[in-house]
Amino acid sequence: MQVFPVWSSPRRAAFRVAALCTVAAVAGCGPRHEAAPEGDGPRIVSFLPSGTETLFALGLGDCVVGRSRFCDFPPEAAALPVVGDLFAANEDALAALRPTHAVLGRADAPQAALLRALGCEIVEGRAETAADVLAFADTLGELFPGRTNGLANARTRWREAMEKISHPERAEVFAPARLASGVSRLESHAESAENAERVLVVVSHAPGRFGAAFAAGEGTYLDELLRAAGLSNALAGVKGYPSLDPDRIAALAPDLLIDVHPDGDPPDEDAWSYLQGVRAVTIRDTAALRPGPRLPEALERFRGLVRGDRGR
């Protein structure tokens, strides 16, 4: 599991992990699920923010009865009872809700043993790339075949939204996009590195100037968004989320630095002032940061940075 250091507060570090959903999956395995207990209908709790968004996007929101404290979208999800966070679960809250299914980043997550003891089926939703999100949606379709009408309608809306990615002027607030088309578009829109602006995406950093930072390398969802938006990752050839000291950051000499800052605390405006000639922007919401159904909105946000839009 990808965990970023607690530099300023446990809340900030945990939120970055939740917002980015950098949950390592079991090597060589896609989404999977285990035998479910019988019941009158699914009662789902989700500990994975991107998983929660996908559940609602597929029309399964009425089955979701609880969430982690980081599952804050859509608004209907934010109104649900909190049953834990990324690493722990509230046994009393779970017992009261009687869930039949639990969405976790991986089947051996810290909460899994308690959930199994309560008779809950574990649904693993890997969330590191756009393809992972599509695979998770397919898993949900297999688990809940009785709700295929909702799934079919959602996929129709996905297809319409994904087609609008090529026409930003017609982009609309996310109505779930067809992730299969989105994955294909992420692959086909990669631009030549010779002409693309070189970008460093920082996902967590120490407070103040000259602090160390973690940034998104190749093979990450943020790297996919960069390439799809016609940008080049300054960490080409580096996998995952490496730790970078100030000297390494300066040596990379990116044209643009994107500081993802999804929590409520104000960003440190002085953090990157030591980088000469580098345009730095801050993205403060989670829409562009979670591998999930808001993929079209995320891609438009990154394309806006190509046009010189300010982060927000």
Q: Can you say where each PLM-predicted feature lies in the sequence?
A:
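Short secondary-structure boundary segments
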Residues: 48, 106, 203-205, 238-241, ...
